[in-house]
Amino acid sequence: MFTGIIEQLGTVKDLEREGGNLHLTVEAEMSPELKIDQSVAHNGVCLTIVAIDGKQYTVTVIQETLDKTNIGELQIGNVVNLERCMKMGARLDGHIVQGHVDKTAICTEVKTEDGSWVFRFEYDKNSPSEVTVEKGSITVNGISLTVVKSKDNGFSVCIIPYTYENTS
């Protein structure tokens, strides 16, 4: 389980296909603290560490995850939002995030409003209209956010300057 509070940013260093799997190598300051078999959220997607080498580590992404997330669109040099699993007894500053993606959406509009940013997202028109609710929690690229507006096949969230400057 995760909180949706991004711990740090990582940089994609290598992408290697093997059958239907993708081996994703990330460089991050947290790498030396990680252990093989540990789960880390990458843009909100729960992935398991399979190798560690200094400041870099590798995870394996299966085809179903590639089909349902934006992980397959990553390129070398891209920045990813990272979060380690929550610790029992620690404060829950975001909301409970499982790291299992329900669907992807496309950002259709970004505008500034009163010193923050409003992002509008749209998803598949065949989706149920109850995917989001106003003032409900949602995770976008691993970031815990509150839905500002919820409409058929879309929603809006507001991003404060700190989040805008410290996440991808």
Model-derived features with residue positions:
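Conserved loop->alpha-helix
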Residues: 1-168
